[in-house]
Design a protein with these regions (language model features):
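Exported/periplasmic ABC-transporter solute-binding proteins
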Residues: 1-179
Length: 179
C-alpha cells in the first residue's frame, strides 16, 4: 500500500530490517518505492499549467508533499509564480490523485482565479490523455514508457512514494527479506 495511505488498520512489515517510513525511503534504507510523475506534452503547456507545475516543484509545493507522507525534494526553491487565470485539466493515476488534490487546494490559496479540474483514472490513461491533449497535465505512479516519451511527453517527478508491504494486524510476520 502507498506510504501516504498507510493507516492503523493493517501492519506494515520491515523489509531487510528497515521500517516503511519516509525517512527510510529517503535515506535508501527502505528500498520499496516508486516515483510520482507528472507529464506534459512538450511545447503545449499553458501559462497556468507552467505556473502550477512551478508551484508543485517549489518549496511550498514540496511541503505539501511531505505533509502528506510522501518523500519530497528538500532542495526546492521558493515559489515565485505569476498567478495566471484560466482552466487546466489534470488527470491520471489514482495513486497520485489524493496528493494532487492537496496540491491543487494549496495552489488555489495563492491563485483563486485558477480553475483546475482533477480526473482520477490510471497512469496509462493519464499519459495517453496528456499526449492527445485531453489532459493538460497527466499523472503516473511509475516511470514513463519509452513510447510515451517518444510521443513528446516531458516527465517530472513530484514525489517519491514508499510502498509499505502489509499484513493483517494479527499476523505474526514482522519482517521480510528482499531475497
Amino acid at each position: 500500500v502507498s506510504l501516504g495511505a498507510l493507516d492503523d488498520s493493517v501492519k506494515a512489515v520491515k523489509i531487510d530490517g528497515a521500517e516503511a517510513t519516509a525517512d527510510n525511503v529517503k535515506s535508501g534504507d527502505y528500498k520499496v518505492s516508486r516515483p510520482f510523475n507528472i507529464a506534459t506534452k512538450e511545447g503545449s503547456e499553458s501559462e497556468l499549467a507552467k505556473d502550477f507545475i512551478s508551484f508543485i516543484l517549489s518549496k511550498e509545493g514540496q511541503a505539501v508533499v511531505a505533509e502528506n507522507g510522501y518523500i519530497s525534494d528538500d532542495n526546492a526553491e521558493p515559489f515565485s509564480g505569476s498567478n495566471p487565470s484560466g482552466k487546466i485539466v489534470v488527470g491520471g493515476s489514482s495513486s497520485v490523485s489524493p496528493l494532487m488534490e492537496k496540491l491543487i487546494e494549496a495552489y488555489k490559496e495563492n491563485n483563486p482565479d485558477a480553475e483546475i479540474e482533477l480526473q482520477t483514472t490510471d497512469s496509462t490513461t493519464g499519459m495517453t490523455s496528456a499526449i492527445d491533449g485531453t489532459y493538460d497535465i497527466g499523472m503516473a505512479s511509475r516511470e514513463l514508457k519509452d513510447t510515451e516519451l517518444s510521443e513528446g511527453l516531458k516527465a517530472q517527478v513530484i514525489a517519491t512514494d514508499g510502498i509499505a508491504v502489509i499484513v493483517n494486524k494479527n499476523n505474526m510476520i514482522d519482517e521480510l527479506s528482499s531475497d
